[in-house]
Amino acid sequence: MLNSFAPPFSLVAGYFCAGFLMLIAAVFAFLGADFDVLISFDTAAFFHLFFAGFVLSIIIGALYQLTSVVLEKTFFTLKFAYVNFALYLFGISGLVSGMLSQKVALLHAGGGALLLSLIYFGLTYLLSFLGARKFNFATISMCVGGIFLIIGVILGFVLVLYFAAGVGNLPFETLLCFHIYFVGGAMFFVILGVASVLLPMFALSHKVKFYLFKLAFVLFLCGGAVLIFSIKFGAIFIGFGAFCFICDAIYALAKRLRKSYDYWNLNIFAGFLYLAISAVCLWFGMVKEAVFALTFGFFFAFIVAHIYKIVPFLIWYHYISPFVGKTKVPLLEQMVDKRAAYVALLLNLICVLIAACGFVDIGVYLEIGALGFVVLNLVKFMSYVKFGSEL
């Protein structure tokens, strides 16, 4: 199925590599952000580098591959996919540069390019669901995620116009709230759907029904409806939805057949710990510390955990599997530098704990070290692309 429906690995790898480049830039942007003024251009630049640059780039790359697997059919179209990737890079780079330099023309150009790129991807992604062989929780959740993405980026461009040109008498705080809700919801629903497929696969816990995932789905939608009347109560619904997701994910990991711990499940457990630390910091008004634990803690650990599983898997099937029976081929686990993975995990843990104690800048610099060890593994993965070339 993978070989029948898979898009070119170069497209998926392009988004992954771009995501990590954006992450490196986000580390430095964090140092210049003012989290006491969350709507400042410097702060907005960091959030867009991290979420629209790193997180969304990884998600798009993964969706090009995983959508075909979940739906058991080819992605709707790959025409102009590479052009769209270039447009995405120009868009996010221009938008962030416009924010940092406060140049209206660059802000408009970058925001417009990013809007077109994400809408094109969102539409081709949603059209992939037409004629799907399976229609279950995973497909519904992933489809809703695509709808949320399109709505979210449109609201985001309206905010760009508001910032850059002061368009009309728009309710800025309401627009910002729903922009965050829809873009965050796109990520949340995609993660819900994909996790309901990947968690049983990677953890070998096939008897989990994911009832709390479904409750999380409903609570997040209800949270959006409540946001219209009250941001506070809407956030409570969304928070409970996220809590249900975490509980079910932990339950699935607890029910795994192989009880050993490795760089994958340890990163996931650490990610949930960082999310709890972020919530505690926010409760005590430590906004900068909370943002660090959420971004470079939870999201970083959660994404890296799955990178360790997904990228070797894709490279093995695209570049190594044709040589099975012809020469000795590596196992998936042999493709991962375990020492580098565990050092990155340990450094990331130290970073978050130090930052939570108030030494955020030190945590940021140490995070560069953790990121470096993750990149070492990425380089090792990519070296297998040339496997068998000497035969």
Where on the chain are the PLM-derived regions?
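Hydrophobic alpha-helical transmembrane segments of multi-pass integral membrane proteins
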Residues: M1-L391
